[in-house]
From Swiss-Prot:
Protein name: Erythroid membrane-associated protein
Membrane topology value: Single-pass type I membrane protein
Residues exposed to the Cytoplasmic side: 268-566
Extracellular side: 30-246
Primary localization: membrane
Gene3D superfamilies reported for this sequence: 2.60.120.920, Immunoglobulins (2.60.40.10)
Record's subcellular location: Cell membrane; Cytoplasm
Gene: Ermap
Modifications the protein undergoes after translation, according to the UniProt entry: Glycosylated.
Modified residues (Phosphoserine): S509
Length: 566
């Protein structure tokens, strides 16, 4: 058996040493290379580092050197997956990493390339605890519009030409060539940036006015290695041709003539348009007048119909009021519920507001905040109607409330809290205390208010006895005893001192409810309202506060209230 050659063993050992101490990541020849990508296209940036076979990539990061913050990356690849953390906001969702198996490396793809993406990119590769980085450059390029050539002017045998184009990046360069293909000298070059950061270019040159053939303008984009060319044909001049001013005049005069003809045509057209517009406006006005007449007739018919309906409603309300009066009851006031500032007559049918509180027992039934009083009657079934004389009072509250309403403290009056009330707030302004409140006006202010309760039907209606009209109706399903409610309200600077008076008998409407002087003959069937003498002189009555007196002229007014005989 032959022994191995010492030289062969040495060679194997050297190769093993090279393999062991060879770095896992090596630099390719692509380091520092410039890559070009069209605007809004996809850029491919190969990482200039490659891995030895069987080496496992731990992490790869792409950075923009010089961009802050340094910790944010363009793309992060770690543990075999793309990562979203620590990414620059402008690159999120636009990058991807593709494996280049041929070079044992990776390619960074940037979609929808922008001008701001151009510049230096750094690829950093980690294998275990070892890392290495190197750079590549991205250049963004845009091929602009086709060049446009036009004659800028004429000057002493020369024709000055201007070549323009827009939408280039990076800055292009322009080349003029004459009819023989020779390069022409550029007279001026202007390059500017538009709002999108792309270059506009305008380059001028000139040729002799006796030149014949094509003149071309070529704009080059060196980054893309592409160009765009436009040519202009120069015609042959005739012998003895006119001078430049004559040529200009020969061009200007026909154009001026065309402009004059065009102006005349436009004036005639505008005149016809105005006439047509005036005719259309006249027709529109005529149609509007006709429509107005029709609408006026329609509104007249509608108004006539509404008046008829209103007349029927008034007749129905009048009939309802007359039926309600068939259920008249004599209501009295309950002194145990009266607020301490209220003063009641001895027969408990009149109530007014005093100047101070009376020393009365603070029983549970008495109102201590709301200046009100309830009727003595409890209604749990049937129909009931009563009338209250309000006279010239400017404020009052009348209606019905549940026996269970709170008597202590401030209470919001509403059907939900067991109150079905109507209030005169000021002048001819009235409110039904619903939730929210319902405001309305009356054609004639009532001197006497009728209140009708139909317990089973769940109806509480208010009537103006003065003109026999309906005021307001509440509807509700009642389940507890109901009682009449009275509140004379504050004095209103002395204009509201008159009392609320419960009528002992039905009152006539219109003139008969106005108090008459004593001594005049009464109408047939009329009787005087019977009043207790203590109403005029309340001293000594347990229902009045000492030194509080009723007005001296109240007696004749109360005696003048008339009621019809039924």
């Amino acid at each position: 058996m032959e022994r191995p050659s010492p030289c062969g063993s040495w060679l194997v050992g050297c190769l093993f040493t090279i393999a062991v101490f060879q770095p896992p990541v090596q630099v390719l020849g692509d380091a520092g290379k410039v890559y070009i990508a069209p605007l809004r296209d996809t850029a491919n940036l190969p990482c200039p580092l490659f891995l030895w076979p069987n080496m496992v990539l731990s992490e790869m990061r792409w950075y923009r050197p010089g961009h802050l913050p340094r910790t944010q990356a363009v793309h992060v690849f770690r543990d075999g997956q793309d990562r979203d953390e620590d990414l620059m906001p402008e690159y999120k969702g636009r990058t991807a990493l593709v494996r280049d198996a041929h070079k044992e490396s990776y390619i960074l793809q940037i979609s929808n390339v922008r001008l701001e993406d151009r510049g230096l990119y750094q690829c950093q590769v980690w294998v275990g605890n070892s890392s290495r980085e190197d750079n590549v450059t991205l250049q963004v390029a845009v091929l602009g519009s086709d060049p446009y050539i036009h004659v800028k002017g004429y000057d002493a045998g020369w024709i000055e030409l201007l070549c323009q184009s827009v939408g280039w990046f990076p800055k292009p360069w322009t080349e003029w060539r004459d009819t023989t293909g020779r390069a022409l000298l550029s007279l001026s070059e202007v390059h500017s940036l538009d709002e999108n950061g792309l270059f506009r270019t305008a380059v001028s040159s000139r040729i002799r006015d006796n030149a014949l053939g094509n003149v071309s303008c070529t704009i080059h984009n060196e980054a893309l290695g592409q160009e765009k060319t436009t040519a202009m044909i120069i015609g042959a001049p005739e012998r003895g041709s006119l001078s430049s001013p004559a040529v200009a005049l020969s061009v200007v005069l026909p154009v001026l003539g065309l402009l004059i003809l065009l102006g005349i045509w436009l004036i005639c057209k505008q005149k016809k348009s105005k006439e047509k517009l005036l005719y259309e406006q006249a027709m529109e006005v005529e149609n509007l007048l006709e429509d107005h007449a029709k609408e006026k007739g329609r509104l007249h018919k509608a108004l006539k119909k509404l008046r008829s309906e209103l007349k029927l409603k008034r007749a129905a309300a009048n009939a309802g009021w007359r039926r309600a009066r068939l259920h008249f009851v004599a209501v009295t006031l309950d002194p145990d519920t009266a607020h301490p500032k209220l003063i009641l007559s001895e027969d408990r049918r009149c109530v007014r507001l005093g100047d101070r509180k009376r020393p009365v027992p603070d029983n549970p039934e008495r109102f201590d905040f709301v200046v009100s009083v309830l009727g003595s009657e409890y209604f749990t079934t049937g129909c009931h109607y009563w009338e209250v004389y309000v006279g010239e009072k400017t404020k009052w509250i009348l209606g019905v409330c549940s026996e269970s309403v709170s008597r202590k403290g401030k209470v919001t009056a509403s059907p939900a809290n067991g109150h079905w009330l109507v209030r005169q707030s000021r002048g001819n302004e009235y409110e039904a205390l619903t939730s929210p409140q319902t405001s309305f006006r009356l054609k004639e202010s009532p001197k006497c208010v009728g209140i009708f309760l139909d317990y089973e039907a769940g109806i509480i209606s208010f009537y103006n006895v003065t003109d026999k009209s309906h005021i307001f109706t509440f509807t509700h399903s009642f389940s507890s005893p109901l009682r009449p409610f009275f509140e004379p309200c504050l004095h209103d600077e002395g204009k509201n001192t008159a009392p609320l008076i419960i009528c002992t008998e039905l009152q006539k409407s219109e003139e008969s409810i106005v108090p008459k002087q004593e001594g005049k003959d009464r109408a047939n069937g009329d009787v005087s309202l019977k009043m207790n003498p203590s109403l005029l002189s309340p001293q000594g009555s347990e229902l009045f506060l000492l030194n509080d007196t009723w007005p001296s002229n109240l007696g004749p007014a109360l005696k003048g209230l008339k009621v019809p005989s039924l």
